């Protein structure tokens, strides 16, 4: 799945008003966080994830792991907040 720049722009606009659905703390991607991400992605096609307590490179690795594990597309990452898109099954 690959989003065009036009699609990303539209998704960024939709995501602007969203609050983070999942917060990842100092422990990183624990089993509980992965389970919460999985449950959240069943109900949200677009969601913000807050990644706290990590350096820039570590945050990037966490985002890549989330995108790979859950087949999501990174729309935008600013600071500690990542906006990801996941196409919901009909």
Where are these regions (language model features)?
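Positively charged, polar, low-complexity stretches
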Residues: 1-90
